[in-house]
Amino acid sequence: VLAEAVKDTLGTVIIENRAGAGGNIGVGAAARSAPDGMTLGIATTASHGINPWLFKQLPYDPVKDFAPVTQMLRVPNVLVINAETAQRLRINTVADLIAYAKANPGRLNYGSGGNGSAGHLAGELFKNQAGIFAVHIPYNGGAPAQAALLGGQVDFNFDNLATAAGNIRSGRLKALAVTTAQRTQVMPDVPTVADTLPGFE
């Protein structure tokens, strides 16, 4: 999408996807490229805000190796539960999830795209603010975590709204809340976690 949008201005754009290690592989490659203005890297909260605290040695310096250009987008996370699990456990709201977790300590688990991922950190913040316990199950990326949720291997996830939206609309996942301070225009009927846990973002 980006390459198409800028081709008339910049000419041919070559997209090179280098996933892995929480963004470190791709961002590291961008950092090692020639500083000639011909390479753009797309950084994330993970690559520049979280990973410096998780990894002893990064293949880049998040401050010195880059010149920021613009913020391209902001995608909220969404607290989702497998629709069949939601029906079986009678969980329709964030308050229901919290009440179930408190009444059944240690019974719930949640998946994420890996230790230190946005979904993991949101899950830990949620547990802390709600005063509940749920076992964290880290996966090797967001796609396997969502597959585990769809397959019923985990009870809930804090997932990227862009990747979860299709399964929410199809009815396979139930969106309980978004993690942003305000509701999202993409799904305006979905409340915020902060509606139940004030200050959560």
What are these regions, as identified by a protein language model?
Residues 24, 73, 80, 158, ...:
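Short aromatic/basic micro-patch
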Residues 44-45, 83, 161-162, 180:
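Short secondary-structure boundary segments
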